Curated annotation (Swiss-Prot):
This is Formamidopyrimidine-DNA glycosylase. Monomer. It catalyses: Hydrolysis of DNA containing ring-opened 7-methylguanine residues, releasing 2,6-diamino-4-hydroxy-5-(N-methyl)formamidopyrimidine; 2'-deoxyribonucleotide-(2'-deoxyribose 5'-phosphate)-2'-deoxyribonucleotide-DNA = a 3'-end 2'-deoxyribonucleotide-(2,3-dehydro-2,3-deoxyribose 5'-phosphate)-DNA + a 5'-end 5'-phospho-2'-deoxyribonucleoside-DNA + H(+). InterPro entries: DNA_glyclase/AP_lyase_DNA-bd, DNA_glyclase_Znf_dom_DNA_BS, Formamido-pyr_DNA_Glyclase, FPG_cat, MutM-like_N-ter, Ribosomal_uS13-like_H2TH, Znf_DNA_glyclase/AP_lyase, Znf_FPG/IleRS. GO terms for biological process: base-excision repair. It holds the Pfam family H2TH. Its cofactor is Zn(2+). DNA binds at H92, R111, K153. Involved in base excision repair of DNA damaged by oxidation or by mutagenic agents. Acts as a DNA glycosylase that recognizes and removes damaged bases. Has a preference for oxidized purines, such as 7,8-dihydro-8-oxoguanine (8-oxoG). Has AP (apurinic/apyrimidinic) lyase activity and introduces nicks in the DNA strand. Cleaves the DNA backbone by beta-delta elimination to generate a single-strand break at the site of the removed base with both 3'- and 5'-phosphates.
Length: 273
C-alpha cells in the first residue's frame, strides 16, 4: 500500500504540471471502487481551474477555484498518472480527467481498494480529515505530544506509530525501518519508552521518510509516480523484506514477526531495547 513518501512523491510529480490547467471533461468509467464513485464527481469540478496539489496523510488533494477539492487515496495498488492525448483506455481505469493542455489524468486501480471524492475545500479538515493525527514533519510532533499519546498504551510501539490518529502516513515499511534506525524493539510497549527513545524515534521517522521521498518512494510491485516512474527506496531498505539476511549494521540475522496481521522486520541485536 502506498504510504506517505509515495503520495508525497506523486504530489511532487504532478504539482507543477497540473496547476493552472482546467478540467474540461470527467469520464466515470467504472464506479466499483471500495467506495462507489459519486455521479457528482463528473460535474462538481468540471471547467474548474486547478489551484494547488497537496498531500494530507496518505491522501492526495487537488484544489480547484470553485472551492472544491479532489481527494484521492491509492488504496493497495492504485495509480494516478498523466497520459498523452492519444492514451488508450485500460481495463481498470476508473476515472479519466481531460485537461486543457490536451493530456489526460487517469485513476487506475486493479484491486479497487482506492477511493476518489470531491469535497468542499473549507470542510476537509473539519469533516473529512477530522480523525487524523499529526503530520510527521509538523512542529507539533514533539516529545511532549508523543509521550502523552504513548503513556497509557500497553501495545507494541510499531502498532502505535502506524496509528493514523497519532501520527499519519507511517505505514508498515517505514515503521519497521524507523524502529530499526531508532534501535527500538517493535514489540516494546509504547508506555515503556523512555524520553530519549521517544526523541530518537521521532528523529528516525523523519529521517527515514525524508530519504524515502528523496528516492521517489518504495516500489515493491505496483507503485509509480505521476510520470509512471517507480520509486527506488527499495534499494535502501535495512530490514523490511530482508528476513533471514544479515543486518547491514551488525551482521545479525533479520527476523520477521507479525503485528496485527502485518509483517514486521527487525534485528534482535540492534533493537534490543
Amino acid at each position: 500500500m502506498p504510504e506517505l513518501p509515495e503520495v508525497e512523491t506523486l504530489k511532487n510529480s504532478l504539482k507543477d504540471k497540473l496547476i493552472g490547467l482546467i478540467i474540461e471533461n470527467v469520464e466515470l468509467k467504472r464506479d466499483n471502487l471500495r467506495y462507489k464513485l459519486s455521479p457528482l464527481l463528473a460535474t462538481e469540478i468540471l471547467n474548474t481551474n486547478i489551484l494547488d496539489v497537496r498531500r494530507r496523510a496518505k491522501y492526495l488533494i487537488i484544489d480547484f477555484n470553485n472551492d472544491y477539492s479532489l481527494i484521492v487515496h491509492l488504496g493497495m495498488n492504485g495509480r494516478f498518472t498523466l497520459q498523452s492525448a492519444n492514451y488508450k483506455t485500460q481495463k481498470h481505469d476508473h476515472v479519466i480527467f481531460d485537461l486543457s493542455n490536451g493530456e489526460k489524468l487517469i485513476f487506475n486501480d486493479t484491486r479497487r481498494f482506492g477511493m476518489i471524492y470531491s469535497f468542499k475545500t473549507d470542510l476537509l479538515e473539519k469533516e473529512f480529515f477530522n480523525d487524523l493525527g499529526i503530520e510527521p514533519f509538523s512542529d507539533l510532533l514533539t516529545l511532549e505530544y508523543l509521550k502523552d499519546k504513548l503513556q497509557t498504551k500497553k501495545i507494541p510501539i510499531k502498532n502505535l506509530i502506524m496509528d493514523n490518529r497519532v501520527i499519519v502516513g507511517v505505514g508498515n515499511i517505514y515503521a519497521s525501518e524507523s524502529l530499526h534506525l531508532a534501535r527500538i524493539h517493535p514489540d516494546k510497549s509504547g508506555n515503556d519508552l523512555r524520553d530519549d527513545e521517544i526523541e530518537n524515534l521521532i528523529k528516525a521517522i523523519r529521517d527515514v521518510l525524508t530519504k524515502a521521498i528523496t528516492a521517489g518512494g518504495t516500489t515493491l510491485k505496483d507503485f509509480v509516480n505521476g510520470d509512471n516512474k517507480p520509486g527506488y527506496f527499495t534499494k535502501q531498505l535495512k530490514v523490511y523484506g530482508r528476513e533471514g539476511q544479515s543486518c547491514l549494521s551488525c551482521s545479525s540475522t533479520i527476523i520477521k514477526i507479525k503485528h496485527s496481521g502485518r509483517s514486521t522486520f527487525y534485528c534482535k541485536t540492534c533493537q534490543y531495547s
